[in-house]
């Protein structure tokens, strides 16, 4: 027995405060399922978060009984099947909420007139002009025919003008062809005459050469001379006999050539005439076929335009019934010869006339109806059919052509950009003086002479300066752009002058020319330079500034303002980019023109940017602290 059991038997109560604490049963750290399996991993974490996801065993049985009582108290509303007639000759039924007597009472208004159908507001119809009687229709058709006849006359006039232009062009072409043929016929005759002249000149030159040779020969022996004379006589006789033969043969050949050329030209002219005749025949045939087709079209239009009163009335009824849905109207129209375009044209023509004769006519609507053109609509449909009937190869070819066109456009744009850039680079500075006087040879010679005279004067001045060393040397003139308002310390200038004067005294030369140069330098150093002269000569006194030994470019100089951390330099670079100030990046930042003034200003700018960033950082920190304190205090 335990101590508690003994105390219960003896009816002795124990103070709970003095009792030792009960030992708690140790629960396993890992949860277990009812099957005894332990949960691990993700399932264990979900179990610890959600707990055992088991539905309660006890069901509330009162909910069903409460709902049942509510259902008993609820009374269903009555629904009645009522007839209605949306159109004449049709009677339909639908369910309406409420009793029959109440609905019948609500169907009539206080005056006793029946109320309109509730869903009648959704029955929207197009506003089509009312069709006119037969007399007005006939008047409208007469006006339409007169207007169309005028339009046809204008078209015929334009076609005639076009044909006349074509005929004129053909006649001009024929005249040009005939002129070319005549020129081609004249050219061979001129060539023959030129050949004859060339041959005559050649023969004359040959005769002269032979005579000169015969005169130049020495007469040594009389026998030889006599023999030669005899031979010459014989040769002359032979030549005289042969000349007419050759001339006759030449004339015969020339006549045959002329006859052949004339025959060929006649054949060519006959061929061209035959071709022209064939072309004229084909053109006349084409024109005849065109005239026949135009006449057929006109006859078709005349037959199509003959609309009766009954047909148009039926057309308006169909348009009103089917709300201008033209495929359905064309399908329901009794005349199969009428196309959808014919129906549209007739409907729009009559509507235009009706609207024009109204008192309050809408001009914008009339203009929109007049914009319809039947031949244009037929062409549009034909183009659309051709587009839809394209093969895949044709589509791919068109796409490739579009891509090539775009490439050409891009290449043209690039070329224009490059051309403009080159023009800007090659653009020469505009001269203030007139250059036309130096374009001629006389102007160039004058310019050359002037330059020579100027050079001589300069040499004379130099010789005079050397001969007069006692004159005070004059420094070169200072440009206006070199002036500035910056003040500098003048103590360094005096120190420099003292140092150079002592240096020149130590290095004393015996050469008189060197002495003259030293004297001029001493005089320049003894003279006190002004601020403008210092800027013009580029003199600068560093003072307490430390300089590295050796030669150094100013563009390679490291600015003292750049001795910052890398993060600060990045933020400085971002800010300079926002201000559109060019930088080289990294630690070698420098302006485009690194002069002394620009480098100094650039260093000041970087230092001011660094201080500005520090101030901004401190400001942001203070603002965040203020917001935090306000949120803590609930302000």
UniProtKB/Swiss-Prot annotation:
Gene3D superfamilies: Homeodomain-like. Residues 303-353 form the SANT domain. GO terms for biological process: chromatin remodeling; DNA repair; negative regulation of transcription by RNA polymerase II. It is found in: Nucleus. It comes from the Eukaryota. One of its GO terms (molecular function) is transcription corepressor activity. Keywords: Activator, Chromatin regulator, DNA damage, DNA repair, Nucleus, Transcription, Transcription regulation. Its main location: nucleus. GO terms for cellular component: NuA4 histone acetyltransferase complex; Swr1 complex. SMART domains: SANT. Residues 148-174, 192-240, 263-299 have a biased composition (Basic and acidic residues). InterPro entries: DAMP1_SANT-like (IPR032563), DMAP1 (IPR008468), Homeodomain-like_sf (IPR009057), SANT/Myb (IPR001005), Swc4/Dmap1 (IPR027109). Belongs to the SWC4 family. Component of the SWR1 chromatin-remodeling complex and of the NuA4 histone acetyltransferase complex. Component of the SWR1 complex which mediates the ATP-dependent exchange of histone H2A for the H2A variant HZT1 leading to transcriptional regulation of selected genes by chromatin remodeling. Component of the NuA4 histone acetyltransferase complex which is involved in transcriptional activation of selected genes principally by acetylation of nucleosomal histone H4 and H2A. The NuA4 complex is also involved in DNA repair. This is SWR1-complex protein 4. It comes from Candida albicans (strain SC5314 / ATCC MYA-2876). The gene is SWC4.
